[in-house]
């Protein structure tokens, strides 16, 4: 059995991850961790996820459960994830990282850690989203410079980063396929007298409202026709199942920084 720890276990995504781990053959939740000031520390992780008692108590310190897991799943915040990354690197633990909002410099720290431990880092662990990335690469290469490209994403009102990590990853895939640097061609929102659109740019629009789990649309608009590639998530479970799948896939892998394209053999 693959022994899995979940960081941020008392949060919305953490509870979903606990459920996904317990539903997956070959995986078992052996540690659950949340922030030290959480009033839920000491509670049974199964009860937190409405699964009943499973005998795993919520801890407030990763070091206290260091001997209890093989791989850590972390969907928290960059500052938290980087601390956990250093711990896992020191102790030889594998990691699944679904945290978004990293800077370029912070992403380099992930790459450095990948020299010592196996890591799967992805902006989105949904199988459908990762298939969409493959389709986006194909569409961008075929359509080339003859279309205007816009990326529209929507998430719940509690999401703290914008655009979403998934939207940015979609932009990177499209830009790379076209031989462009996303940092140079991205346009984040528009206001006022913007003038005619530059076809070399890639536009981003963000919606934050209600309880939207995650909607992403990439629009390729030409004269006379347009192509839209859309993915809509209706449950966090799709991300959680993908993360657990990645955790099982990492078993026995050499050190390296992988992503879901590797897990799904889409390269």
From Swiss-Prot:
Family the entry assigns: Belongs to the DapB family.
Reaction catalysed by this enzyme: (S)-2,3,4,5-tetrahydrodipicolinate + NAD(+) + H2O = (2S,4S)-4-hydroxy-2,3,4,5-tetrahydrodipicolinate + NADH + H(+); (S)-2,3,4,5-tetrahydrodipicolinate + NADP(+) + H2O = (2S,4S)-4-hydroxy-2,3,4,5-tetrahydrodipicolinate + NADPH + H(+)
The species this protein was found in: Pseudomonas putida (strain W619)
Biological process annotations from GO: diaminopimelate biosynthetic process; lysine biosynthetic process via diaminopimelate
Pfam family for this entry, one: DapB_C
Function: Catalyzes the conversion of 4-hydroxy-tetrahydrodipicolinate (HTPA) to tetrahydrodipicolinate.
A cellular component term, taken from the record's GO annotations: cytosol
Pathway of action: Amino-acid biosynthesis; L-lysine biosynthesis via DAP pathway; (S)-tetrahydrodipicolinate from L-aspartate: step 4/4
First-tier enzyme category under EC: oxidoreductase
UniProt binding sites for (S)-2,3,4,5-tetrahydrodipicolinate: 156, 165-166
Alphabetical list of PANTHER family matching this protein: 4-HYDROXY-TETRAHYDRODIPICOLINATE REDUCTASE 1, CHLOROPLASTIC-RELATED (PTHR20836:SF0), DIHYDRODIPICOLINATE REDUCTASE (PTHR20836)
Keywords for this protein: Amino-acid biosynthesis, Cytoplasm, Diaminopimelate biosynthesis, Lysine biosynthesis, NAD, NADP, Oxidoreductase
List of residues binding NAD(+): 8-13, 34, 98-100, 122-125
Highest rank taxon of the organism: Bacteria
InterPro entries xref list: DapB_C, DapB_N, DapB_N_CS, DHDPR_bac, NAD(P)-bd_dom_sf
Active site annotation, chain numbering: 155, 159
Lineage of the species this protein comes from: Bacteria, Pseudomonadati, Pseudomonadota, Gammaproteobacteria, Pseudomonadales
EC number(s) per entry: 1.17.1.8
Localisation per UniProt entry: Cytoplasm
Membrane spanning residue stretches: none
GO MF annotation: an example: NAD binding
Protein name: 4-hydroxy-tetrahydrodipicolinate reductase
Record: residues binding NADP(+): 35
């Amino acid at each position: 059995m693959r022994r899995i720890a979940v960081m941020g276990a008392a949060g919305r995504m953490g509870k979903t991850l606990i459920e996904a781990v317990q539903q997956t053959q070959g995986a078992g939740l052996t540690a659950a961790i949340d922030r030290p000031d959480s009033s839920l520390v000491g509670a049974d992780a199964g009860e937190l996820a409405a699964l009943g008692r499973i005998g795993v108590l919520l801890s407030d310190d990763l070091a206290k459960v260091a001997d209890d897991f093989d791989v850590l799943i972390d969907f928290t915040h960059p500052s938290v994830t980087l601390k956990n990354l250093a711990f896992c690197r020191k102790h030889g633990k594998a990691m699944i990282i679904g945290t978004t909002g990293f800077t370029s410099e912070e992403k380099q720290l992930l790459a450095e850690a990948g020299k010592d431990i196996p890591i799967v880092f992805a902006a989105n662990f949904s199988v459908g989203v990762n298939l969409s990335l493959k389709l986006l690469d194909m569409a961008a290469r075929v359509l080339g410079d003859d279309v205007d490209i816009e990326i529209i994403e929507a998430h719940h009102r509690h999401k703290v980063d914008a655009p979403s990590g998934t939207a940015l990853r979609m932009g990177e895939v499209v830009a790379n396929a076209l031989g462009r640097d996303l940092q140079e061609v991205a346009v984040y929102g528009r206001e006022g007298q913007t003038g005619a659109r530059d076809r070399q740019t890639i536009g981003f629009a963000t919606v934050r409202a209600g309880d939207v789990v995650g909607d992403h649309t990439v629009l390729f608009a030409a004269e006379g026709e347009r192509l839209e590639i859309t993915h809509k998530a209706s449950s966090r479970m799709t991300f959680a199942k993908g993360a657990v799948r990645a955790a099982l896939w990492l078993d026995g892998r050499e050190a390296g920084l992988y992503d879901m394209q590797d897990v799904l053999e889409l390269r």
